[in-house]
């Protein structure tokens, strides 16, 4: 495990596990874990931006990002009523559909196109009208609070990053986010945080830090760490592109021999 507090070098998995030479595109799968509002999605966004992928047509992207929130299980009417009052624990492992998460990541690793619903935080439900289509890519970022919690899912990752941000900063980010973007009121946000979010982080999320290959203190503010990770991913993409070009040349040469 590497803690990137004052990092100027970075030793990361080299992507050998991702089959660049296979005809089917098997991506390099990166897990990005961390507490609520730690900056996981922002880290993924910055990685995408620096690699020139954010504005690219989604059918052509070499790097894609997926949120674990899309794998919350459907709530019962009683659970939805609790959720509206901030009384449902969305930070507990049982809140997620582990099997769907696992099968979807397996299909992605097999190079299949998959469709993933978005999550509507205002209604606490999956939005199947707004489906994210994930096309085969070279690198896939999968971010969420508990992406390292489930053993069989954790084993799928070629690289594991943990975004480590102090609890005061995370709470300061979560309150305005949940009020402005998710339609919550202050009392509900604070009740949910103290009752569920904080205890669940300490019990389920924080212990998974030990599984990380790299810890990123201060999240997206740690530009040095992000630059090093971007450089490493760039090397993986370059290797993949080189292998694909080599395969194309070999196929072309083979065709020429058959023609003669």
UniProtKB/Swiss-Prot annotation:
GO terms for cellular component: cytoplasm. It comes from the Eukaryota. Disruption phenotype: (Microbial infection) After infection with E.chaffeensis, results in reduced bacterial replication rate and increased survival. RNAi-mediated knockdown in the whole organism, in the fat body or hemocytes results in a similar phenotype to the genetic knockout. However, knockdown in the eye, salivary gland or wing has no effect. Pathway: Pyrimidine metabolism; CTP biosynthesis via salvage pathway; CTP from cytidine: step 1/3; Pyrimidine metabolism; UMP biosynthesis via salvage pathway; UMP from uridine: step 1/1. It is an enzyme of class 2 (transferase). ATP binds at residues 34-42, 221. Substrate binds at residues 91, 119, 174, 184, 192. It holds the Pfam family PRK. The keyword Acyltransferase does not apply. Keywords: ATP-binding, Kinase, Nucleotide-binding, Transferase. (Microbial infection) Required for optimal replication of E.chaffeensis in the immune tissues, hemocytes, and fat body. Belongs to the uridine kinase family. This is Uridine-cytidine kinase. The gene is Uck.
């Amino acid at each position: 495990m590497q803690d990137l507090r004052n990092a100027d070098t970075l030793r990361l998995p080299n992507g050998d596990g991702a089959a660049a030479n296979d005809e089917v595109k098997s991506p390099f799968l990166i897990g990005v874990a961390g507490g609520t509002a730690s900056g996981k999605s922002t880290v993924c966004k910055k990685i995408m931006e620096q690699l020139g992928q954010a504005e690219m047509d989604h059918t052509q992207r070499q790097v894609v990002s997926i949120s674990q929130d899309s794998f919350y299980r459907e709530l019962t009417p009683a659970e939805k009523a609790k959720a509206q009052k901030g009384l449902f624990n969305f930070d507990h492992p049982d809140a997620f559909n582990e099997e769907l998460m696992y099968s979807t990541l397996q299909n992605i690793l097999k190079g299949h196109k998959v469709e993933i619903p978005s999550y509507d935080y205002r209604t606490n439900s999956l939005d199947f009208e707004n489906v994210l289509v994930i096309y085969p890519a070279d690198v896939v970022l999968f971010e969420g609070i508990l992406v390292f919690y489930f053993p069989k899912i954790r084993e799928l990752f070629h690289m594991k990053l943990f975004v480590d941000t102090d609890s005061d900063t995370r709470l300061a980010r979560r309150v305005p986010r949940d009020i402005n973007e998710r339609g919550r009121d202050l009392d509900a946000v604070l009740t949910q945080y103290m009752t569920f979010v904080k205890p669940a982080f300490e019990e389920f999320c924080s212990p998974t830090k030990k599984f990380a290959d790299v810890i990123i203190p201060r999240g997206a503010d740690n530009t040095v760490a992000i630059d090093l990770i971007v450089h490493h991913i760039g090397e993986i993409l370059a290797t993949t592109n080189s292998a694909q070009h080599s395969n194309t040349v070999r196929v072309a040469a083979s065709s020429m021999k058959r023609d003669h």
